[in-house]
Regions:
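Short, well-ordered alpha-helices that flank and scaffold nucleotide-derived cofactor binding pockets
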Residues: 13, 17, 21, 42, ...
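Interdomain hinge/lid region at the active-site interface
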Residues: 219-276
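NAD(P)+-binding Rossmann beta1-loop-alpha1 motif at the extreme N-terminus of oxidoreductases
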Residues: 1-57
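NAD(P)-dependent dehydrogenase/reductase Rossmann-like domain
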Residues: 265-300
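Internal alpha-helical scaffold of NAD(P)-dependent oxidoreductase catalytic cores
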Residues: 36-43, 110, 128-220, 283-289
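Rossmann-like NAD(P)(H) cofactor-binding subdomain of soluble oxidoreductases
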Residues: 44, 49-127
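Short active-site oxyanion
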Residues: 1, 24-28, 62-65, 87-91, ...
């Protein structure tokens, strides 16, 4: 199938390289920075045409168009294409948070539209092109578009799942929680350990094997089954010591994270046979401490 890609950043370049190796014909690369697009094009055979943003009328022969621009530009790109694509191709964007509704102008002009979002970090186009194998892709859009997207992902040796349009933002929140916010959480753990007199670098080095072992457990168990430590044991006294130590040493917002995650942990522990009496007491303490912390933040 003939493909054009609008927006040759890291992901757009990675898709161009990966799809060309799977037999797709990359016809056009549309980019602001011709130098970046040229580097990608030189590694594709036959070499695609490089166009600027004002030449989208030349995309009429494309069967599939990917819009891989920044999220803030997708709607304007779609509006600019509407009416120019007489062959009514499939059009996909690759935003994680936006749904195919952002392509409504193209849909109204007869194009089949959808979104394809790979759950992988692409920091370089050439490295990214080799990372799609076994990666999950979130698909969303009209039925025909999703069917085509499933084939594309299969050809890339990836795995796909579809969500309804109304759930696209929630899906993305899940992905951000599992990636960027996990990183933020680990940074809090590092700060806690560093407050014991270690450097941040040493604290991170010490904690990473523990983090890795947790993820290894999660590969085989549910979150509730993988829960270990203070909350899994419903250890009230140890939790009290944690709270006191954090209060004494660290900022209130870090205590809030501990309290909120502690509450979530008690819910997980309930399903694993921990002491119901102790868990009820832990919940009460967490709620009281959270209220105090909020009051202190407001007064501060």
């Amino acid at each position: 199938m003939k493909i054009s890609i609008i927006g040759i950043g890291r992901l757009g370049g990675a898709l161009a390289l990966a799809l060309s190796k799977k037999g797709y014909s990359i016809e056009n690369l549309i980019a602001r920075q011709g130098e970046t697009a040229e580097k990608i094009a030189e590694n594709i055979s036959p070499k695609p045409q490089i166009l600027n943003a004002s030449e989208t009328e030349k995309l009429g022969g494309s069967e599939i168009i990917f819009i891989t621009t920044q999220d803030s530009e997708i709607e304007a790109v779609a509006a600019g294409l509407a009416g120019k694509l007489t062959n009514k191709p499939f059009v996909f964007h690759t935003s994680g948070s936006l749904s195919s509704q952002i392509l409504r102008d193209l849909n109204e002009s007869g194009c089949r539209v959808g979104s394809i979002h790979p759950l992988v970090s692409v920091s370089d186009s050439f490295l990214g092109a080799r990372r799609f194998k076994d990666v999950f892709f979130c698909l969303e859009g009209d039925a025909e578009a999703v069917a085509v997207a499933e084939k594309i992902v299969g050809d890339l040796q990836g795995k796909s799942f579809a969500v309804e349009t109304k759930f696209k933002a929630l899906y993305h929140a899940s992905a951000v929680t599992a990636s960027g916010q996990v990183t933020a959480l680990i940074s809090i753990a590092v700060e806690m350990l560093a407050a014991c007199g270690l450097t941040n670098e040493k604290a991170q080095e010490i904690l990473l094997p523990l983090v890795k072992s947790t993820f290894e457990n999660l590969e085989k168990q549910t979150p509730a089954e993988a829960l270990t430590g203070t909350f899994a044991r419903a250890d009230v006294e140890t939790m009290k010591k944690h709270i006191a130590a954090i209060k004494e040493t660290l900022a209130p917002e870090l205590l809030e994270v501990y309290l909120q995650l502690g509450l979530r942990s008690t819910h997980l522990a309930e399903t694993q046979g921990a002491s119901a009496e102790n868990l009820a007491l832990m919940k009460k303490i967490l709620a009281v401490e959270n209220a105090k912390n909020w009051k202190g933040n407001l007064q501060g």
